[in-house]
Structure formats: C-alpha cells, structure tokens
Amino acid sequence: MEPAPSEVRLAVREAIHALSSSEDGGHIFCTLESLKRYLGEMEPPALPREKEEFASAHFSPVLRCLASRLSPAWLELLPHGRLEELWASFFLEGPADQAFLVLMETIEGAAGPSFRLMKMARLLARFLREGRLAVLMEAQCRQQTQPGFILLRETLLGKVVALPDHLGNRLQQENLAEFFPQNYFRLLGEEVVRVLQAVVDSLQGGLDSSVSFVSQVLGKACVHGRQQEILGVLVPRLAALTQGSYLHQRVCWRLVEQVPDRAMEAVLTGLVEAALGPEVLSRLLGNLVVKNKKAQFVMTQKLLFLQSRLTTPMLQSLLGHLAMDSQRRPLLLQVLKELLETWGSSSAIRHTPLPQQRHVSKAVLICLAQLGEPELRDSRDELLASMMAGVKCRLDSSLPPVRRLGMIVAEVVSARIHPEGPPLKFQYEEDELSLELLALASPQPAGDGASEAGTSLVPATAEPPAETPAEIVDGGVPQAQLAGSDSDLDSDDEFVPYDMSGDRELKSSKAPAYVRDCVEALTTSEDIERWEAALRALEGLVYRSPTATREVSVELAKVLLHLEEKTCVVGFAGLRQRALVAVTVTDPAPVADYLTSQFYALNYSLRQRMDILDVLTLAAQELSRPGCLGRTPQPGSPSPNTPCLPEAAVSQPGSAVASDWRVVVEERIRSKTQRLSKGGPRQGPAGSPSRFNSVAGHFFFPLLQRFDRPLVTFDLLGEDQLVLGRLAHTLGALMCLAVNTTVAVAMGKALLEFVWALRFHIDAYVRQGLLSAVSSVLLSLPAARLLEDLMDELLEARSWLADVAEKDPDEDCRTLALRALLLLQRLKNRLLPPASP
C-alpha cells in the first residue's frame, strides 16, 4: 500500500484546488495566508519538518499555480493591490532558486507580448533589485547532498548567466533596463561580493562553505565576454576587502582556483586588465600560477606571446605579480628567456605583426627591470646569444620600426646583462615609443612616487630668485648706487638694430658659370670652396643651359652618382640628388638608360642603388607634370628653352631666375587689390603633352630585366630585400606617372608579372611595395584596357589580394590589399552594372 499523504501534502493540494477554481477574493486571500505558514511568515508557524517538506516538494507547484492564475481580473478581486502584494511575496520570500526558475520558466513560456509576460518580467526585476540573486548563490555555496542537486546547479548556472539573452529575446522592444547586459552583469558582480562576504562570515562561524558555484558563474560570464562589467565591479571591492584580511584573500584564491579550465583564460585576462598594480593582482591570485597548469600557460605564454591586447601598465602588473613572490620568480626568469628567444627569432620577426613585436619588446624590458643581477648572471650566455641573434635579424629588416626596436632593446639588454663590458650604442630617432621603452628599462624606486616628485618641485618653482639682474650688475654693486645710471644703461634702446638677415658669407672662389666648368670642378678641383660652389650652382646651370647639359649629360650623371662629400656641406645629399634629377629631366632617355644600367652593375653600394631609384622617381614626376613643356619662361631667363623649374631649384642661390621689377610691382598690386567680380570664367592652365610619354619605357623596363639574377655583391632575392622593396615602390610610382601614355598597358602587364613572381615574399616591406604596385596598375589604366588586355592577371590577383587582406600578419599589407580589392570592385561595378530585377 502507498503511504498516506502527509498533512502538508493534503493542505497544499487543497490550496492549489482553491486557487485554481475560486473567484472569491477573500477565499483566495485566506488560502494564500494559510500557505505562508510554511514560509515562517504567519502565526502559528509550521513545524521545521513541515517547512522543509513544503520547500523541497511543494513550493514550485504552488508558484506555478500562482503564475497560471495571473490576470488583470484575478488581481482585482481584492482592492488596493492587496492580492497582488501577497501573490508577489511568495516569489520574493520563499526559496530563491525555485522562485527564480519558475519566473524564468513562465517568462520563456509566455506566448507573445501579454499582461502576464510583462508582470512576470517586472517581478523578476524586483527579484534582482531586492538581492534575491545573492540569496540564490548563497544557498548553492552550502554543502548539499540532495538528489538532483548537480542538475539543479547546472540549470541555475545557465539561467543566471544567460538571463539578459533570454529576456531580450522575449521582451524585445519592451525590455527593461535591469536586463540590459551592461546593467545586469554589474549587478551580478555586486551580488558575488555579497556572497563572498557571506562565505567569509560562515567560515568565521565555523561552518563549511564552497565557492565553486560562484566560480562557475564568474567563469561563464567572462566566457560570454562580460569581463569588463562584472570584474569592473568585483575587482575594486575585492582589492579593498583583501587589503587587511587574510581570510578574504584565501576566499579569493579559492574563487579563482575553482574556475573551470575552459574559462580560466577569460577570467585571468579580465583580472589582469582590471587589477591596478601587481600588489592587487597578487592578493587576488596568490600562487595560482604555480599550482594550476592552465593558469601558468595563460599567464606566462598566451598573454605574452600570442596576444598584444595588454597595455603597458597591465604588462607591468602581470610581470610584477610574478616577481613579488620567491615561488614565482623562477617563472619570471624563464619568461625572460622565452621572450628573448622569440624576440630574436627571424621567423617571428617576419611573420609577427608589429604591435605584437612591440608587446614582446616591452615585456623583455619589464622583466629585466624586475630581475636582479645575481639572477641574470647564471643565464648570461643564453640571454646574450638570443639578444645578438635578434639584433642581427632586426637590423636586416626593411621596416624602420623593427630596426628601431632592435636598437633600443639591444642597448638595454646588453647594459643589464653584461654591465662590465663595452656598451652597445646605436643612433636612432627618438620618438614617444623609444622614450617609453627606455623608461620601462629604468623604473623609479618604490618610494619615488608622483606625490614625492610633486612636493620636491613645488619649492623650486615657488621660490623667488636669489638675486635680481639689477643686483648683480657691476659685480654686485648695491642697487642704491645704480639709481642714477638707468638712463646710461638704456641709452642705446632708441637705436634700430641693423638688418643682417640678407648677409651672405664671403667666398674666395667664384661659382662656375658653365656646366662643363662644374663638371671639371667636381672631378679635378682640390679647392674645397670651388667644389662646393660648383655643386650648389649646378642645378640652376643645368636648367638654364639644356643644350650644353645634353652634350655632357651622361658624364655629368656618372660624376654625380659617384660623388662623395669632401667636406661638411650642409644639405649635400639634397644638392646632389636635385642636380641628378635636373640632368635626368633635361636629357631623359640617355640618362635614364645609364642610371638603370648602373642599378644592376657591380661595385655599387645599396645607398647608391636606392639613390638611382629616388632620382628616377623624382625625374619622372617632373617630366609628367602638366605645363612642363612649352611653359612661358620667366622674364630675365637667359634661354627661351628653359623647362619648368622645380620649387627646390628656384630656392637655391645659384639657380634663382632674376625677376623683372615690373613683374614684382604687378604682383604686389594684384595681391593688394580686392575684386568683387570678374567678367568671364577664369581659364585653367593650358594643356600640354607629357614629356614622360616618350621616355617612360627607358625608366621602367630596364629595372625589371635582371631582378632575379644575383650578383656577387647584390642579391635582390636574398639579403638585399630592402632595395627590392624600394624597387617595388618605385615601379608602382612610375606606373602611376605613366597614366594615359601609350606604353602604359605594356608597363602594367609587366608590373603584374613582377608582382606575381614575388607575391609570397617573406619581407613585409616588399609585400607592401607589391600591393601598392597592383593599386597603381588599377588606377593608371583605363577600365576597358584592363578587361581587354589584363583580365587573366586581374583574376589571379583577386584571390591573392583576398588572402592577404585576411591572413597577412602585417597591418599595412592588409590595408593595402583591401584598397586594391575595393578598386577591383569599383572597376567591376563600373563595367558590369547590376541587372534590373
């Protein structure tokens, strides 16, 4: 026979029947009050055994019955909201876990927008505001052995963390502010603090507690990407609580230790980002990094080598945490070894984005600042070997930021690891990053805070000067003796200073007046002043005497290409380059043929080869400039055939064209005259053919002929990748300058073949040049010619560009690939308009 139903079961069954069928408000009110006996709210209270039976077996059915009866008419059975308040008290005063689950079940089961849905949602918001979520988690922290407890915990875990998603899906436009993720997870963080405080109180009272459920809630919330909201509230509160309580520290350590492995990375990353300083991080984590392998991997590998999201203060907190305990310091030394090994790896330098390389460099310097000389001494040889390998690879890089990182880190590492040896010194441009890195390498002592610095500076700035200028005149003569001498001291103030801004240094050697004289002075003269005067006058003479220049153009280009600085001449490189550009512009084809032939010749330095590329680019730009041919010469110009002068040439003393005084006066009148209107539209500059049209092939094609043939001293596909990158950029620039020329299509086809042969180059600077070259082709050729002559090449390039835009480690390469893809898409849209529906 089945056992007889208990008194509680019979009472609950009768109450549910009455609540389901009765329409009498007084009867319903009395029934609910009778049930509240089992919650300990009414007199006479039920027995503890009856309360436990009601809470474990009958509370959820009662709540479901109350939720099913919810309607406007049912709540109005009693006036003044008495029935509604009594109805809500069952959800707010009984077991929090069951009330929460019934609330969520009713909300998720509601069929569309309704009165019941909104009423239950508002009741859930009140449930959260009154701290019932903390009560729910406190109940899960007690050691429980009831059947189904694990299943209940998993259900609660999913509902608690995913509450904003569930409510957002059900309420949509009617969602309440309490359920917004940014608000809910902050509230959840505050409730976690309350639960941890309750756990501490229980431990102080001698009761056992567990924080595993809270750890799972924290881990799942962080995995969902809500670290900032929940830890932004949790970490400052815990930092304050753990500062003076070792028991709070132990509870925090246990909280993080019991986070599931799948959520450990998200939680630790959020803690490192939220903790202000290594002291706070150490109080929250303890020696977790030593005990937990997953935590050790995250803290010493993933955050340092595989990510670059941590800022400099976060890196200092993380590595400072490793340095603050004797059990963790061996990990810090091991981290430094692995960081330097990665920093010095040629493969990592080629395939790692620049932000990640900066991240690793900062971590290396912070580690060095945290470790002492005795700890570094035992690993000196290993660290020096990694550092020297890294310096070599970084100085060979084509990217200036990579080279600068190598110089800065090498200086600091060598000084710290081998202080008694000769220091490494490099010359590099100081910028914000270099100053930050050097500051990381030499941190201030613990006592040198900002406040101390501020107090030391205040007296210096507030203290009046010990002596005034009047007191130190004439060797300290008293001011009373100088009272009558003020007029004598100031008597020269009425004189106007002589203007010496136009003065020029007197030269004993006169500047040459002919191009041949300049060639002779540059090649044979031992007079330094005459040599310098010839160099400064050469550009202007070339532009003013094109006929004489063409007679010796190749010889002059050869002289300038091999010219070395005999003495310290201000702007020597610029003078030499502008003179070479002037010669190339004046006689383009022969000089371009000579320069391109010398680019692949023996016995030239990399600097000379890059100078050739720069000169070709600048000369092509000058030749393609509109109005460069047939331009009216300035009055006073000695030759009617003078080409357009570059601005730099006009600014030089030796190449300035004398201006007629009438021109000066007319220009002043024009600048001072205000005209309200003019009769006709202003005409644009007169059009003229591009001089680059006929010589573009001389500049372009010879540079492509031998790039894959190594020489004894020059290998573009080997170590000289810097020049290869400059060559790719130069070819792209020449392609842009050849727009609308007859040879542009052939140039574009050859350039795409060059790009295709090198598309998988390991150097980022070379890839940047290749991607720029592709964009140059797309911008320079007419759309019809691209589709007619280069369709196959463009189809091949499209898939490569998409792959680069998605996977290339260099950010600039990804950006250039995206621009090229946009140009291709624009070309497609222009030629193939969308079909009408």
Swiss-Prot record:
The record marks 490-492 as: Interaction with PIH1D1. The modification Hydroxyproline is found at residues 374, 419, 422. The modification N-acetylmethionine is found at residue 1. InterPro entries: ARM-type_fold, TEL2_C_sf, TEL2_Regulation, Telomere_length_regulation_dom. The keyword Phosphoprotein applies. One of its GO terms (molecular function) is molecular adaptor activity. Pfam families: TELO2_ARM, Telomere_reg-2. Residues 459-471 have a biased composition (Low complexity). Disulfide bonds: none annotated. It is found in: Cytoplasm; Membrane; Nucleus; Chromosome, Telomere. One of its GO terms (cellular component) is cytosol. Residues 444-472, 627-651 are annotated as: Disordered. One of its GO terms (biological process) is protein stabilization. The modification Phosphoserine is found at residues 456, 485, 487, 491, 688, 836. PANTHER family: TELOMERE LENGTH REGULATION PROTEIN TEL2 FAMILY MEMBER, TELOMERE LENGTH REGULATION PROTEIN TEL2 HOMOLOG. Belongs to the TEL2 family. It is linked to You-Hoover-Fong syndrome: A syndrome characterized by severe global developmental delay, intellectual disability, dysmorphic facial features, microcephaly, abnormal movements, congenital heart disease comprising developmental abnormalities of the great vessels, and abnormal auditory and visual function. The transmission pattern is consistent with autosomal recessive inheritance. Cells overexpressing TELO2 are hypersensitive to hydroxyurea (HU) and undergo apoptotic death in response to treatment with HU. Component of the TTT complex composed of TELO2, TTI1 and TTI2. Interacts with ATM, ATR, MTOR, PRKDC, RUVBL2, TTI1, TTI2, SMG1 and TRRAP. Component of the mTORC1 and mTORC2 complexes. Interacts (phosphorylated form) with PIH1D1 which mediates interaction of TELO2 with the R2TP complex composed of RUVBL1, RUVBL2, PIH1D1, and RPAP3. This is Telomere length regulation protein TEL2 homolog. It comes from Homo sapiens.
